[in-house]
Amino acid sequence: ATRCASCGAEIQASGFLWTRGEKLPHGRIYDCPHCSDSGEHAITDEDIQRIEQLQRSELMHRSRALSKVLGGNIADRETVEAAINIYPVRSLYVLFTLMNKMEGMTLSDQRRELLEAILLSLMYSGNAIWSWPEERERPRLLSIPTQYIEKNLWLEIDQAIRTWTAEVPRVEYTTWPTMPTKNGVCLYPGRMRDLAQAAEGMRIDQVLCVFPRPNQAFWTLCSLWASWLWGREKAGK
């Protein structure tokens, strides 16, 4: 929570703005529902007190995140620590509070999968590789930009629910030689030259020869998220 600079009401900030290497943020972003004040504003003493209180237990939160991935194995410690270090301590606190709550609940498989989907979205949004002002493309490197935004994960929960419940057209996919009945994707497990002969006389709108590879940041984070959600052993399968 933060306070509106205009009316003084306690509201939720959509994010806090940081400079890499600094111990405290320099700004906050919000849309006040009471007086409609919005945009960037300077940080307040009250905001600083809240952050400093959480920073006192930062080592504990990072150790918990690390042990969830490594267990007793220290072989990959340096790589895992580098990935965890791109998360602000407040994000780690929220993520592991929610995961601990979920582990203590009796849930059906379907409900557990839905909660895990929301958590994945929060893990995606909660790291500090999002530059400010925000860029259109997903970050490609596992590094903190000079200016970055720490997103409010409590507000991101609402966005995650909207994302996962959005109605999108279903894309049919098949494996060669079975073709989609309408518009769709057919996977051909072979070489392009063989496909050219096999598909002679057929109408194919587009051919994708090389699948895009996940960038370094996303690939590393996927491994981290899987370990956090399901444990190191299951994540490695």
Name each model-derived stretch.
Residues 207-208:
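Hydrophobic beta-strand segment of the Class I
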